[in-house]
């Protein structure tokens, strides 16, 4: 949600 690499990382884990 912007410049936070945390969210994309979580999405990758969930996927």
From Swiss-Prot:
Origin: domain of life: Eukaryota
More info: On the 2D-gel the determined pI of this unknown protein is: 4.9, its MW is: 32.3 kDa.
UniProt protein name: Unknown protein from spot 662 of 2D-PAGE of etiolated coleoptile
Organism in which the protein naturally occurs: Zea mays (Maize)
